């Protein structure tokens, strides 16, 4: 029997989403929390089953890469897909953390009374149906389903095909555990078709989704931003900068640079461009770049001043850096590559940040209060840090729990996309018969009588 065309397949999955989303929006906090804890217990109980499914995914990835790439690349691809018991424990812990977070739905964010007696309040409500397209591991799958459930949204999830069996094994247990705790059937939808067209049809589904979140590389984000027919929550390729001021604690700043770049080089909030005040460059840069090159195998691309300084290191046996191209200053690398530039002062650093595209995360390493305050005031980013690793631009670092990525948008969500960012606000107004004036002149005896009522 021939397969259903991809468009019909996606349309069929989305058909009942709006109805189920209305049910999810009305669930009480205790029911959702109980379900999330049951889901955590089920993942822990299904550990062997999940790892067995993952082993099949790993074998499939290994076979697909055998004839196409070098052994090193094949090993890297296999390592990326393989899950361990530690990953299962992390999934379980994340589910329990989400269960323990306050329920944002129904929270009153503000309330006031008008002179005419109107009692006005703003209340948080779910967004509705949220699509998530991920190129990342099953940890992102679970975060997406858990956060959408907790915030009263229905999640339509399309994961990376290389984890297809792993996703199915995890999702089956989660679904059964959730339904046993009173969650409606169809509380989330998993798109299982591996074709890219399935993701494209989801992006183009228009009014079937209220928002969409891409989790992956620059190519995915660009495709979603260009073709989506609904609001998109994601970072728009914004860069992460770190400026080292001339007044700084050098060991502290060096540790921040290393952590920001190598703790997770592929993350959106990993360091892309390092700006160093030139007076301390000779003292600050050589030890840091030496570690990045030799210890962490980071490719360093430097401005002319930086390459001239570090060129002396190459003569003494160290791996050297390469000259930076113009495009490097505008690139979100999401990998083991770092651009380094020596600047004259804070003015030049700020001008560089403004002149090279959107900024997602910005850090200043300084002991000078005035410099710190100016930097935080003038840099336009989702987060601006003082003497803190850029990797801490995340929901858990802020005490907000897990997140479904970072957003660089100026509208709705800017920064980590956590529970609160998966809701919107509506106005709830109580009154006692207040009318908009002037009220229409009565045209009949009945109208006149109604207006005279106390």
Residue ranges and their predicted role:
Residues 1-120, 147:
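N-terminal Rossmann-like NAD(P)+-binding subdomain of aldehyde/semialdehyde dehydrogenases
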Residues 4-8, 136-155, 169, 173-180, ...:
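ALDH superfamily catalytic-core signature
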Residues 127, 322-454:
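Conserved C-terminal structural/oligomerization subdomain of aldehyde/semialdehyde dehydrogenase
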Residues 27-34, 181-188, 263-270, 297-305, ...:
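Flexible, glycine/charged-enriched surface loops at secondary-structure junctions
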Residues 107, 157, 190-192, 213-216, ...:
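General beta-strand structural signal in soluble alpha/beta enzymes
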């Amino acid at each position: 029997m021939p397969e259903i065309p991809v468009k019909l397949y996606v349309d069929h999955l989305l058909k009942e989403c709006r109805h189920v989303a209305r049910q999810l929006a009305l669930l009480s906090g205790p029911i959702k929390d109980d379900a999330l804890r049951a889901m955590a217990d089920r993942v822990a109980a299904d550990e062997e089953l999940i790892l067995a499914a993952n082993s099949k995914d790993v074998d499939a990835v290994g076979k697909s890469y055998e004839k196409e790439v070098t052994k090193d690349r094949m090993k890297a691809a296999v390592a990326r897909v393989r899950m361990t018991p530690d990953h299962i424990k992390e999934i379980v812990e994340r589910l329990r953390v989400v269960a323990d977070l306050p329920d944002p739905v129904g929270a009153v964010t503000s309330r006031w009374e008008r002179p005419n007696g109107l009692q006005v309040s703003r209340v948080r409500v779910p967004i509705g149906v949220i699509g998530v397209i991920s190129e990342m591991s099953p940890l992102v799958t679970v975060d997406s389903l858990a956060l959408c459930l907790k915030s009263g949204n229905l999640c339509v999830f399309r994961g990376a095909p290389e984890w297809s069996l792993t996703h199915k094994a995890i999702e089956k247990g989660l679904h059964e555990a959730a339904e046993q705790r009173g969650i409606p059937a169809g509380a989330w939808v998993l798109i299982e078709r591996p074709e890219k067209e399935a993701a494209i049809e989801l992006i183009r589904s228009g009014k079937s989704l209220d928002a969409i979140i891409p989790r992956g590389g620059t190519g995915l984000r660009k495709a979603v931003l260009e073709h989506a027919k609904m609001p998109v929550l994601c970072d728009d390729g914004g860069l992460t900068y770190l400026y080292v001021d001339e007044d700084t604690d050098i060991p502290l700043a060096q540790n921040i640079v290393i952590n920001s770049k190598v703790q997770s080089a592929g993350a959106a909030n990993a360091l892309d461009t390092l700006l160093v005040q030139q007076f301390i460059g000779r003292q600050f840069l050589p030890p840091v770049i030496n570690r990045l090159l030799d210890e962490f195998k980071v490719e360093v691309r430097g401005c002319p001043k930086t390459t001239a300084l570090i060129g002396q290191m190459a003569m003494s046996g160290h791996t050297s850096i390469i000259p930076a191209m113009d495009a490097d200053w505008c690139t979100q690398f999401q990998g083991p590559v770092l651009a380094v530039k020596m600047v004259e002062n804070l003015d030049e650093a700020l001008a560089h940040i403004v002149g090279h595209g959107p900024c997602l995360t910005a850090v200043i390493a300084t002991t000078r209060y005035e410099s710190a305050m100016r930097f935080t005031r003038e840099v336009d980013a989702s987060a601006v840090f003082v003497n803190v690793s850029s990797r801490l631009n995340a929901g858990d670092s802020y005490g907000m729990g897990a997140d479904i990525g970072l957003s660089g948008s100026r509208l709705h969500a800017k920064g980590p996309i956590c529970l609160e960012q998966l809701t919107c606000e509506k106005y709830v107004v109580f009154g006692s018969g207040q009318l908009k004036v002037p009220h229409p002149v009565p045209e009949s005896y009945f109208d006149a009588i109604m207006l005279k009522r106390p």
